[in-house]
C-alpha cells in the first residue's frame, strides 16, 4: 500500500494491478485510513474487483501463486514484490515467467541481479541486465546513506552498528 500511496500522484506511472490476499473493499479502507501515515487526502473508492484512487482504476487480484498471475496479458513492466515470501531468485523468477519485465523486491534477496540503496549505489543500475532488483533491508536503507556521507567526507575504514528491530513474523521472541 505504501508504494502505491507514495507513487499514485505521479501521472507518469500507470498503476495497473494490486495483488493481495484481501478484497478491494478492505484494501480501499486500509489505503484511505492508514494508522501511521494518516488519512489519504484524495478520493478512494472500490468496485468488486478494483480500487479507484483519485479516478484512477487499479485492478485487484488475489492470486497466491506468481506463475498464475496475468502479467503478460496486463503488459506489466515492473512488479513490486513486497509479500516477504518471494525473496530468492527462483521464486521471484515466477513473476518474470508470468510476463513481468522486472521485479523489485522490497526486502533483502538471495541472488538478485543487483541490490540497490537509493542515494548510495543506484547509479549502478543497468536496465539491460538488471531484471531482479532487491531494495535491501530497512536497516540497510537507514544506515547506508549515513555511512556514505561519512565515508565520502571523512573516510570510513571499519564500522559497527547495533539495531533494535520490531518483532516480525520471521523473528523469534525466545
What are these regions (language model features)?
Residues 1-173:
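N-terminal Rossmann-like NAD(P) cofactor-binding subdomain of oxidoreductases
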Amino acid at each position: 500500500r505504501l508504494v502505491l500511496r507514495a507513487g499514485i500522484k505521479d501521472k507518469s506511472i500507470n498503476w495497473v494491478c494490486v495483488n493481495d490476499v484481501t478484497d478491494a473493499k478492505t484494501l480501499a479502507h486500509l489505503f484511505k485510513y492508514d494508522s501511521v501515515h494518516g488519512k489519504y487526502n484524495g478520493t478512494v473508492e472500490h468496485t468488486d474487483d478494483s480500487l479507484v484512487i483519485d479516478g484512477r482504476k487499479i485492478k485487484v487480484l488475489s492470486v497466491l501463486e506468481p506463475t498464475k498471475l496475468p502479467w503478460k496479458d496486463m503488459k506489466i513492466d515492473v512488479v513490486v514484490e513486497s509479500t516477504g515470501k518471494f525473496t530468492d531468485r527462483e521464486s521471484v523468477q515466477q513473476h518474470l515467467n508470468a510476463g513481468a519485465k522486472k521485479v523489485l523486491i522490497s526486502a533483502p534477496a538471495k541472488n538478485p541481479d543487483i541490490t540497490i540503496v537509493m542515494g548510495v549505489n543506484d547509479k549502478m543500475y543497468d536496465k539491460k541486465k538488471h531484471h531482479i532488483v532487491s531494495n535491501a533491508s530497512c536497516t540497510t536503507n537507514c544506515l547506508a546513506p549515513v555511512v556514505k556521507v561519512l565515508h565520502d567526507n571523512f573516510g570510513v575504514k571499519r564500522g559497527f552498528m547495533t539495531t533494535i528491530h520490531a518483532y516480525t513474523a520471521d523473528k523469534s521472541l525466545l
